[in-house]
Amino acid sequence: MRNIIMTAALMVALTGTAQAENYDNTTVSMAAESATMGISLSTNDTSRSIDVYTMGRSLDFGAGVSDNGTNRDYSVSVGKTLDVLNVGPVGTYLSGEAEYNWGDTFTKSEMHFTPTVGGKMDLGLIAPYAEVDYMLKSVEGDFTSIDKATPNFTIVTKVALGTSTSLNAKLTNSLNSDWESTDKEVSVGLTVKF
């Protein structure tokens, strides 16, 4: 219980005004996960969202709702992650996700396709990883017309706080089509396994 209270205090400290001045959109999330399913609640400077998802299956599925106080958007997704090469505590992976989006901020529904390549390490209590993804999205209402959206570079450190609780600290660097930095976002998340 003490670890949970300390973690909650750390999350509040990391998302105070000093952090929000340095980055455009600081996110705090909490997730509860079983071996095959999870639910996540998150909030940032502009919106709140809830996501339900599966894990560890041949294909993973998800559904989400995001609300910014004025508009409400919905999404359903399917994805797959493949471990490519694992040597000791170091590994690499490829993943892909297709997401269908609709709601108040979309004139017509659109599809997002996100291929990702990443590297990870498992050091016991600490498990850092880094990944690069490149989102492709359809023109609203025309799923056959695909535009490049944005690449992202993400660095994450996952710290085990106990046997069933972990804290994730994430830095996401959004890039433009020339791979130059356009925005940085910090996220802090607490995950509880049951």
Question: Predicted regions: what is each one?
Answer:
Residues 1-21:
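Gram-negative bacterial Sec-dependent N-terminal signal peptides
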Residues 1-2, 9, 25, 36, ...:
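Low-complexity, intrinsically disordered short peptide segments enriched in small/polar/basic residues
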Residues 16-69:
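Short glycine/proline- and aromatic-enriched beta-strand/turn motifs that initiate or cap beta-hairpins
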Residues 21, 45, 69, 82-88, ...:
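Outer-membrane beta-barrel transmembrane domain signature
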Residues 71-74:
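Phosphate/oxyanion-binding active-site loops and adjacent basic polyanion-contact surfaces
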Residues 90-95:
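Extracytoplasmic beta-rich ectodomain segments of secreted or membrane-anchored proteins
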